[in-house]
Structure formats: C-alpha cells, structure tokens
C-alpha cells in the first residue's frame, strides 16, 4: 500500500491520543505475572502489543482481549514452557522484555523474530543474565535472536550496559520480583532512554512491587524486593506522547493549532519532552485539564535548536521533520542508538530528507539539519512505522510526497492514515 500526500494549509484540529504502546506492553506482562485476574483498560490495539499478548498465551497465560479492555489471568510468576518457538516478528519491545521474563517458565523457551529482528542486539542483556547464572544461547548470530532461554531468574547483583537500549534494564526489572532473593541492578556505560526505565518502575509499583532507586542518572542502582510480588489490578492505559508527536509536529510545521486529549502532562513518558522542544523552536503550548494545545502563527518562522535526545529516541524523527522547515540549523545529539531500531533511523532521516531536497549531515551520534528548499518525492520507510508517519507529516507541508509500504504504521498506530486524512481534508476549512 502507498499513500500519496498533497500539500495542505494551516491546520486547526482536535483528536484523542492513542493509548501508550509502552505502557500496554508493560501492563500485559506484569499482569501475566500477578497472582489473580487483572483488567487492563483502554489498551493499544496494534501489531506490537498483539505480539506480546500472543507470546504470553504461548507461555500459558489466559487472556481475553476485547475492544475496551484485556482481562489477564495471572500465573503468579509460574509460566509454562511453550511447545513451539515464539516468533515475535518485528516487536523489539516484546523480544527484549520477554527475554528476562522467559526465565520464569518451567522449561526452555526459544524466542525468534523477523530478519531485521535477528540483526538487533540482545548481547548486553544476555551477558548480564548469563553472568548471573542463567543459560541463554544465541542460535544464529552472536548477541542476537533467535535465543534459547533456560534456567531460572537469578538473584543478587547484576551489571548491565545501558548505552544501547533501556529495554535491557526493563526486562530485568519486570522479572526481578520473582527471584529467590532481592535483585540489585547496576547500570554501566552512559544509559539512554532513562524515562522508559522509570515507566517500567511506575508500572511495577502500580501492581504492588517494591523498587528502590539509588545513585544518580549516570550510575543508577535499582533494588527490587523478592518479598513484594505483583498483585492483580484494574489498570488504565494513558495516552501516548510518541504517537501524538506527529499531530503536534503537523501543527508546528504547517502552522495553526492541534488540540490533543487523553495525555497526562505529568506523565513519566520521556517523549513528553517534545512539547518543550517545540516551544524552543517557536511554538506555544497551553495545558488544560483534559487536553494539550500546541499552536504556531503561520507568519512566525520556526527556528533551529541544539538538543540532546538520548532520553527520547522515538521522537527524533518527528523533531527532524520540524527542523527541515526551520529558518536556521538544528543539531541533535545522543542518537547513536537509533541505528539499531526497526531500521537505521539516522540513515532513514538523512536519505529521506535528501530525497525531498533537504540538507543533512550525520555522524555516529549527531544529526545536523540545515534550511533548504524542499520538494516532493518518494519515501521508502523500510518497514519502519516511525519513518512513515514522520515523513507523512512533512509531506502535508511540501505536497507531492508518496509513502511506500504505508501499512507498516499498524505496528504502533493502526488508525494513523485515517486520522491524517480527516485532518488534511478539514485543513482548508480552518
């Protein structure tokens, strides 16, 4: 499927934030480990979250997924070894979070995925668990899926490299209450995406776990009590700042306003920082009780900024689209881990913007975007949902932009194209 995007003028629209993908993943897995039935309300129904649910069912978890909620019959931390390997396809979150959790099964578990998934790193997580006494074997390429997971979840001190993915730490955190004794997780390297770790801890505490945080942002230590295991809960999923970023960016790029409901202004989500970034680029923000409004006068030029985005990688592409129409250069640092996402996102940004006439410089950890006249073109997202959605938003400003393989957005936001079509059609009426 391809989507052809024409130019639209200033926008003026309201929409609801999709449910958080990150919180849905975490709630599903934690509820599956709790002792009793939990209800997850307002979940994200997308490819990735469905993949986590299917994997949990293969691990012996009973769940009932309806449009409004998911009822999960928890196992008390006693998972069943699956008869067949678990193929989580392209869901990196499922792969990483379930690697640690699979050590709670009563036998070996094999996790595999798509061709791209088999290139994505698991090494630091595997090394940490094996050094602590687990038995995890890579079945194809060193440090990558597919993996065979055996043994039990270890207690005591663990040291994990946090410079590649925060999901390695989240994987350890979520399973840790079911170790025989307390677990102490020490981060090494320069940790990235720390807010995602706090989202994990936030979810764990909501289900009754005890997690203590010591140290500082550079060398935090997390202590998880083995005496406070998960209890069943009724748990509501808050709105997703990552997916909402495209609508805020649309108003920033085209001018006008976007009113997004369902977002928590005090959320632990690191991608909430987008609002601060867009204000620094020339937009204004108004927070109301149940909505956040971003606006920009079309006569006021956007300006470039210098920003470190190590803690909010999922909105880097969104910010790059705004930078591409700004009046001065933008320099983004802290992005080295983007090369190991669903695609090499640094290359995707550079190639896509160059195709549309943009001027981009990249290094291992840096993206610099210069002002340049833009024109239409064809974008190949390489099955990366965030590439497709980001360039679609920019396409509304440029016009004559075609997004190939547009169905890839179902990974995180199945309703994206329908929502964009509605906003685009109404833009001329504002």
Curated annotation (Swiss-Prot):
Gene3D superfamilies: Enolpyruvate transferase domain (3.65.10.10). It is found in: Cytoplasm. GO terms for biological process: amino acid biosynthetic process; aromatic amino acid family biosynthetic process; chorismate biosynthetic process. The keyword Cytoplasm applies. GO terms for cellular component: cytoplasm. Pathway: Metabolic intermediate biosynthesis; chorismate biosynthesis. The keyword Transferase applies. Keywords: Amino-acid biosynthesis, Aromatic amino acid biosynthesis, Cytoplasm, Transferase. HAMAP family: EPSP_synth. This is 3-phosphoshikimate 1-carboxyvinyltransferase. It comes from Methanospirillum hungatei JF-1 (strain ATCC 27890 / DSM 864 / NBRC 100397 / JF-1).
